[in-house]
Amino acid sequence: MESQNIRIRLKAFDHRVLDQSTSEIVNTAKRTGARVRGPIPLPTQIEKFTVNRSPHIDKKSREQFEIRTHKRLLDIVDPTPQTVDALMKLDLAAGVDVEIKI
């Protein structure tokens, strides 16, 4: 019989909150008897915005802002029903986007 995998992608602007949420998921999965592959750090997406400092003149004077989106990937191999229940009840920090594929 084919083994089931649960793939979890996490995204956040703050890498500390992301790593904390990742460790919570890994600990929950290991406690219920599933094997975990990861966390795998994916490339950080950097989005830059350039705006004029002055509203009227001085085109040469500009300011740059950036948003960094950090990502992690987890694979849970052979999850038990207890693993799925524990992951559904898990309360993660605000600001972490979670995508789950089965």
Curated annotation (Swiss-Prot):
Keywords assigned by UniProt, alphabetized: Ribonucleoprotein, Ribosomal protein
Database matches in InterPro entries: Ribosomal_uS10, Ribosomal_uS10_CS, Ribosomal_uS10_dom, Ribosomal_uS10_dom_sf
Record GO cellular component, one term: ribosome
Keyword flag Ribonucleoprotein: yes
Keyword flag Ribonucleoprotein: yes
GO biological process: translation
Superkingdom per UniProt: Bacteria
Gene Ontology molecular function terms on file: structural constituent of ribosome; tRNA binding
HAMAP family in UniProt: Ribosomal_uS10
Protein's job: Involved in the binding of tRNA to the ribosomes.
Description of how the protein assembles with itself and partners: Part of the 30S ribosomal subunit.
Protein name: Small ribosomal subunit protein uS10
Species this protein is from: Rhodospirillum centenum (strain ATCC 51521 / SW)
Gene name, Swiss-Prot/TrEMBL: rpsJ
